[in-house]
């Protein structure tokens, strides 16, 4: 028996409303949440067409093998940034004509693996062993309305298609639980004499990888309490009378990161010449959502962890893209983009995007519409309340980096020898005393 997908009814209405308009196919993304028992699909969004594709609409015999894999993969990467913790790109859908119904499976398989590879490359976290790794492909025939739902294990390159159940249901995410967290980020990334020549982006990613371990190993307080991983998240919560669907639970989460290593871990300090540093500082707003069907604490904590890691990494990546796109000259201080939330109609879930200070609300609205193919209202935009907007500072000591050349490198062995002599000075002194004593004894017995 394959996996079961519980799908919001509005997703079915959206898919039914898509008109091919002479195109051989239309493809897009399915967004939702995985759980051990079943998966939930709460949103579908078609991939926006390329501008140059508008001139090729009149080609009815186009093959699905010509599906622009790179363009669809980039769309998935962009949309993944707009998902708070707990939500993922669950898979893809494709709507085709009857003539092309048998020509889609290979193209879908390649696309689903390409998307997963692209999105996983940017992650600061690793997939756990017990995590659901199946992703869905949904094929709809525009003529017969027949649905074919299959899954692939994206962690297994040799995975073959498995059938899955596709079931519509109303108000799937109307009572999902939200977890809110504000994290103060203070990441110091020293630049060694060798890494100072690397790009700001590469050095930042290296530092974020080390910081991610702190977040992964942190202690998470949910409403001020530490709960066991296998406990029910709603344990101890009062049940509301009447319609439980109308009540949305919200949890406050705080993160305690470990400053010192445990006593059973030995630490050795690495001393190196630094020619500068990169610093990330500020408060970032994090938010995660989890289904209300007996959710576990470990699933909620994992959703929060990943949102913390994703939002910081995404902000840095957006900054680097902006610097490259607009050819902004290097400077010491950069302001990271702020997070903006927007509600999903009929749901307690909010999606997100990022804006720089000089971007207008209209630009953010248009970006939401382009990426998610859903109209939103400007008044629904919620800019995250970040008291200190996260920023990045970069300082490079050019003199230090220039003086630390290969000409000075031969001195390092001398320093090492000197250190070794200091470390073994006691042994040397003892040896000298022993030699002196032996000499005196020899002289004594000679007399």
Swiss-Prot record:
The chain crosses the membrane at residues 82-102, 425-445. May play a role in the trafficking of a subset of G-protein coupled receptors. Keywords: Membrane, Transmembrane, Transmembrane helix. Its main location: membrane. It is found in: Membrane. It comes from the Eukaryota. It is a multi-pass membrane protein. This is Protein odr-4 homolog. InterPro entries: ODR-4-like. Belongs to the ODR-4 family. The keyword Transmembrane helix applies. GO terms for cellular component: membrane. Ubiquitously expressed.
């Amino acid at each position: 028996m394959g996996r079961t997908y519980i799908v919001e009814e509005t997703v079915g209405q959206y898919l039914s409303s898509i008109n091919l308009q002479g195109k051989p196919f239309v493809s897009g993304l399915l967004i939702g949440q995985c759980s051990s028992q079943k998966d939930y699909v709460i949103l579908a969004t078609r991939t926006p067409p390329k501008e140059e594709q508008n001139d090729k609409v009149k080609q009815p015999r186009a093959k699905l093998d010509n599906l622009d894999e790179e363009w669809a993969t980039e769309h998935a990467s962009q949309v993944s940034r707009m998902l708070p913790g707990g939500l993922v790109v669950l898979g893809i859908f494709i709507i085709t004509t009857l003539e092309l119904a048998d020509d889609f499976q290979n193209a879908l398989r390649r696309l689903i693996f390409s998307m997963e590879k692209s999105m996983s490359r940017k992650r600061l976290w690793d997939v756990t062993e017990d995590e659901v790794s199946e992703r869905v492909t949904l094929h709809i025939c525009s003529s017969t309305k027949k649905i074919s739902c299959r899954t692939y294990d994206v962690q297994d390159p040799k995975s073959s298609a498995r059938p899955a159940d596709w079931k519509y249901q109303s108000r799937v995410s109307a009572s999902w639980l939200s977890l809110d967290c504000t994290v103060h980020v203070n990441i110091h990334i020293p630049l060694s004499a060798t890494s100072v020549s690397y790009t700001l982006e590469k050095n930042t990613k290296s530092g974020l990888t080390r910081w991610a371990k702190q977040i992964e190993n942190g202690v998470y307080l949910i409403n001020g309490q530490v709960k066991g991983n296998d406990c029910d998240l709603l344990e101890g919560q009062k049940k509301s009378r009447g319609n439980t669907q109308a009540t949305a639970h919200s949890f406050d989460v705080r993160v305690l990161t470990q400053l010192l290593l445990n006593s059973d871990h030995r630490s050795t300090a690495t001393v190196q010449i630094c020619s500068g540093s990169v610093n990330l500082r500020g408060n970032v707003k994090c938010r995660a959502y989890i289904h209300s069907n007996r959710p576990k604490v470990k699933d909620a904590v994992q959703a929060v962890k990943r949102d913390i890691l994703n939002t910081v990494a995404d902000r840095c990546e957006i900054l680097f893209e902006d610097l490259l796109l607009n050819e902004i000259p290097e400077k010491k201080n950069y302001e990271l983009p702020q997070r903006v939330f927007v509600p999903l109609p009929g749901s307690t879930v909010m999606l997100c995007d990022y804006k720089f200070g000089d971007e207008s609300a209209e630009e953010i609205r248009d970006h939401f519409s382009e990426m998610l193919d859903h109209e939103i209202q400007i008044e629904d935009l919620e800019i995250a309340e970040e008291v200190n907007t996260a920023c990045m500072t970069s300082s490079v000591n050019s003199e230090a980096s220039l003086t630390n050349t290969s000409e000075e490198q031969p001195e390092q062995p001398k320093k090492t020898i000197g250190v070794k002599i200091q470390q073994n000075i006691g042994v040397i002194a003892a040896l000298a005393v022993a030699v002196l004593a032996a000499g005196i004894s020899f002289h004594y017995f000679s007399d």
